[in-house]
Structures are given as C-alpha cells and as structure tokens.
C-alpha cells in the first residue's frame, strides 16, 4: 500500500476535505450521507461496498449528480479502496474490532490502523469533531429512542433550536452546515457507534445496560465496556446523566473534569431528579430557588410503563441542565405522542386496544412492556433468537399475560419456557396476519383487553427489520378493523 497523505483531525474544519482523497466504507444510510457531505465539500470520494451496483441501485441514485469512485461487489479487494487515502470514513457496522465485519475488510482496516498513518473515523465521530453546537448523547441497551425523542421534545420547549439524529435513523453529518453554537443536538448512540468514538458529547445520558449484541462483542463484559465509553469521553464541564435504578449504570463514575446528575424512581437528592408523592420531582440544586421541585404528575405522562417514567426523568434532567423552565418541560412531556414501534398505540375497537412494540427484541424490554398494562393482555411474540435467557421473561409473562400467540423461529423455545412458568394458553401462528387474528379472538373473550406485539426476538426470520414487522402488525390490525366495520 502506498504511503498516503492524511487529514489532521485536530482542529478540523469544513474546508479540510477539499481536493483530498477520502474513502467511505459502506453505502447504507450513513454511507450515503457521508458520501454526499464529503463530495459537497470538495473531497475526492471512493466508496467501497461488498454489494453490487444492482443491489445498491437505490443508494447510488440517492447520491444525485455526485460521481464518487465506486468499488462495489464481492470481487473487489478492499485494500484497493484504502490505498492512498487522506481519511477513511466508516459506516456504523464496519470496524476492525467487529467479527461481523467482512473478513477481508476487517483485515485491511486493521493493517491501516496498525500503520497509524491514515485516520479512520466513523460518521458520528466525524460529526462530533465538526459540530459547533452543544451535544447530548443518549445510550443504553433499551429506551434510547424514546429517551432521545423525549429529550428533543423537552429541549424544543426552550429557546434554542434542536436537532435530533444518530442511530434513530437520521445521519447528522449533512446537517452540519446549518448548525451554530446556539443549537442543541440530541444523538441516539448505539453499541455500533460507541467503540469508534474518539470525541464525546457534552452530556452523556444512560438509560440502562443489560446484554445485547453479544455476537459482535463476544461477552457481556466487553459489551458493557463499550457502553460506558460515552461516559469516559465526557469533556471538561461535561455531565453524566445516570440512571441509578440500573445496577450497571449506577456504578459508573465520571472523569474528574466532568460531573454527574442522577435520576431514579425514588425521592431525589439535591442534584438529581426522582419521584415523590405521585410527581416527577427535581432536587433543590436542579431548579430555581423559588421552585418547589414539582415538575409533572405521574398521571400526566402519556406513555405507559415504569420504564417510561425513567425515560421522562432522564429528559427532565437534561431539560433542567439546559435551563428549560419546569412548566415548559411538563407541557412538552404531556404533549409527547411516543415513538413508532415502541409501545405505539395503533388502534382501539370492539373493546380491544392494539399496541405495537416491535422494537421489543430483548427479554428485558418485553418484561417492561407486559408490566405496563393492567387489564386482560394477549401477547404476540417470537422471531429469531438473540441467544439471551428467557426464564425471567417467562415468569413475567405467566404472571401478567392471559394468553400468548407465538410465531417465528423461537416458537418452540418460548412455548416450552412459558408453559414451564405456568402459562396455560399458548397458540401458534404462521404469519403476522394469523397472529393478529388469533390474538383478537382471544382478546374479545374478555374486554376491555389489549393485544401487544412485543416479540422478545429479532425480526430477520420473517421480516427485513423490526420496522417492517411493526408495519405488518399495523396492517394486520387495520384488516381486522375493516372486518369489524363490515360486520356491523
């Protein structure tokens, strides 16, 4: 490999890319945004992806009239894409550390990193190095998207303009030209994005940390180490917003240069947010001297479940840190409509409410979901196993759920676990349409009732992703609603 020039990441500005050779690895959502941004700022971009041009037709079309050098397909040697570059930019799923990265690319990247001549930077890391605005990073195993969205809503009730993005599906790199020091940027950050960070956010918010993606990180300890990276990277004056109800997160400490604000579903201390007497409460150090600390009644939180109380606590803490008035925070939370595929209320008819929690791919998330509902509950679950234990899930389901309809590859595993835990009514379905139909029949036996899709499994055995699974659920519910209208 030829000795490449390099871009100095220290003091990086938007003009640093002009006439510089830059490689982009991966042409999915993040890679498309990187390619457009770099090309628009004068870089000579090379794009590498193992998929063919035919497979990437929509992605290539999304580049518009930009004409990067495209090295596409399984026959391309990734070393060719990395040769003579000033900078290498990676998509979230690409890293020399990940066993899930294509082996040849992983090896070629490792060689570049070992040589130390050319910076390798992710889209999020590049954004944070260039961003002039205050930043809030949100991470955890579950609850990231809802908490990020709540924080954006709460900050939006203040005076500063707010931008939301990151793992929530909106790459932020293309938003850089419009950002100023007066903006607030909220980034949802996944375990894919954290290991490659070398620049932290001004505030690091943690929901909770259990276990997930062990195929990529190898062990629970390695996964947890990745998750705490956002706290480790806090800058001078940075703030860790820490969930003290979580046994892992509550043990996190901050560097001497930063400070911490905690939240928990219990009475708050001076520099924390908590719950007391049916209210979201802020400690004395979090609110003006003439304020009694009461922010919002728990009964006014529009999204169900104790875990969503925790999410509101985190958002409240961030809002107060940025000077949003307590009354404005309360109004923002009361008006929060929730997030698609996360305990999303889809419809209510014939005495049955339908809830889409397709993003509930992990047992812990489903436990929280079933505990969010009091009345007659029918659960739709199943999919591709994530290799996580289901005993605690089975106990919660047997305690809180009247019946389960199972589908997908984990049907037999979940049926055995639920039966052993004492659940008597277990049905099976071969499609989402059949699952919703069967669940509806059971739910109508005792109304009011709730049908909850919360799979406790990945979607890839039957769907492209959890979003496609959620859309299929909503379509099936719409079909049942239409049948109900016709029968009247």
PLM-predicted stretches and their roles:
Residues 38, 88, 138, 167, ...:
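Residue-level signal for inorganic ion chemistry
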Residues 39, 79-85, 92, 96-244, ...:
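Phosphate-binding loop of NTP-binding sites
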Residues 1-122, 304, 483:
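N-terminal leader/targeting and accessory segments in enzymes
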Residues 43-51, 241-244, 378-381, 400-410:
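Short internal beta-strands
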Residues 46-49, 71-74, 119-125, 165, ...:
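Beta-strand->loop->alpha-helix junctions that form or flank phosphate-binding loops
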Residues 5-21, 33-41, 295-402, 416-419:
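Nucleotide phosphate-binding/pyrophosphate-handling subdomain across enzymes
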Residues 66-67, 391-449, 487-488:
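C-terminal helical cap/extension that packs against the catalytic core
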Residues 197-200, 230-236, 253-256, 372-374, ...:
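Short, conserved loop/helix-junction motifs that constitute active-site signature segments
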